[in-house]
């Protein structure tokens, strides 16, 4: 498994990161451990979670389940893992929001909130620090200065090594960079956004999705590494029935249909799955380079994704994929 530098930190991380979102809820502990062990055996080291994972998966789940499972697994493995978690998207009353449309009320990125949430995450994870800590959902209600000063304090305290941001617009990233430079605070080295082979439709809400503006920003700011989440768009590439999922709302249209068709055609030509074609395409990207974050629910899903590492696309095949669209 290849590694890449995280920003300009000198830190080498796996280009294929393992998301633990469903571990402890939809994925039972035994299967979660099997996936994690297999990932380590394959040479991976970058494991991603969040304090809110995964309250929405069913009654009785309140958040923190993923971190708790990881904490038990990490007992004898902490030194082998680059560990990322997130704060600011905790939900105090998940039962109220689980079946309601729209976005729940998140805890936010106030200084005291982040300090409290990180301490709780460290307890669940059974460690004294995380390697990467994200603001999970950008908080427009809290002054950025307050959030950034609190994050700087967490780094100074040795509880966090590197910082990141997620679900954030490009203008905010630039504002964050400028404030960090002005005050001497540690700046984010990673931005975790939804990114896949499909392109957002015209007029899409791209707060959480990499759009052309953000691609341009990332190409010109190599100190910030893209971590691409939901690369498979909830299984829509391989299963047309999955294209009814709300994740597709910002992609639907003729361009998406044309790209789905090209992925299916190339997968047939190569004797692989559409998911593997998409992951291989992402892993071949160089402008910008990105960490591809997968979140398998089962061990077979993980094995399918892992096999994409062996799929080497030719220049002609990459051009075929890149030129597709309406």
What are these regions (language model features)?
Residues 6, 18, 32, 47, ...:
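Conserved, mostly hydrophobic/aromatic
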Residues 1-82, 156, 232-234:
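N-terminal binding-site loop/beta-alpha segment at the start of enzyme catalytic domains
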Residues 27-39, 107-125, 174-178:
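Short, acidic/polar
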Residues 32, 66, 114, 118, ...:
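Aromatic/hydrophobic pocket-lining residues that form the small-molecule binding cavity
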Residues 55, 142-326:
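Beta/alpha (TIM)-barrel catalytic core signal, keyed to glycine-rich beta->alpha loops juxtaposed to Asp/Glu
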Residues 5, 13-17, 45-46, 80-84, ...:
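Structural preference for beta-strand elements that scaffold enzyme active sites
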Residues 7-26, 84-105, 129, 134:
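N-terminal small/glycine-rich loop or linker at the start of catalytic domains
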Residues 58-64, 91-108, 241-244:
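Surface-exposed, active-site-proximal loop segments in enzymatic domains
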């Amino acid at each position: 498994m290849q590694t890449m530098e995280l920003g300009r930190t000198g830190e080498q991380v796996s280009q294929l990161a393992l998301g633990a979102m469903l571990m402890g809820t939809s994925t039972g502990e035994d299967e979660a451990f099997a996936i994690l062990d297999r990932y380590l055996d394959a040479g991976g080291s970058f494991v991603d979670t969040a304090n809110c994972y995964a309250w929405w998966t069913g009654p009785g789940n309140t958040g923190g389940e993923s971190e708790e499972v990881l904490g038990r697994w990490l007992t004898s493995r902490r030194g082998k893992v680059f560990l990322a978690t997130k704060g600011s998207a905790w939900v105090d009353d998940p039962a109220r929001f689980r079946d309601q449309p729209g976005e729940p009320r998140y805890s936010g990125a106030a200084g005291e909130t982040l300090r409290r949430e990180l301490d709780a995450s460290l307890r669940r994870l059974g460690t004294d620090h995380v390697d990467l800590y994200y603001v999970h959902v950008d908080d427009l209600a809290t002054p950025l200065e307050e959030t950034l000063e609190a994050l700087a304090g967490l780094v100074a305290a040795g509880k966090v090594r590197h910082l990141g941001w997620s679900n954030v617009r490009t203008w905010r990233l630039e504002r964050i960079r400028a404030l960090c430079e002005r005050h001497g605070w540690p700046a984010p080295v990673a931005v975790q956004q939804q990114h896949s082979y499909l392109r957002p439709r015209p007029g899409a809400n791209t707060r959480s999705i990499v759009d052309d503006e953000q691609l341009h920003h990332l190409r010109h700011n190599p100190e910030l590494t893209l971590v691409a989440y939901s690369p498979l768009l909830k299984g829509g590439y391989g299963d047309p029935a999955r294209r009814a999922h709300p994740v597709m709302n910002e992609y639907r249209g003729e361009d998406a249909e044309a790209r789905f068709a090209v992925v299916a055609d190339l997968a047939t030509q190569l004797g692989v799955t559409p998911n593997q074609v998409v992951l291989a395409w992402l892993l071949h990207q160089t402008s910008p380079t990105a960490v591809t974050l997968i979140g398998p629910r089962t061990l077979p899903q993980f094995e399918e994704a892992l096999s994409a590492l062996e799929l080497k696309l030719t220049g002609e095949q990459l051009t075929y994929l890149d030129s597709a669209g309406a």
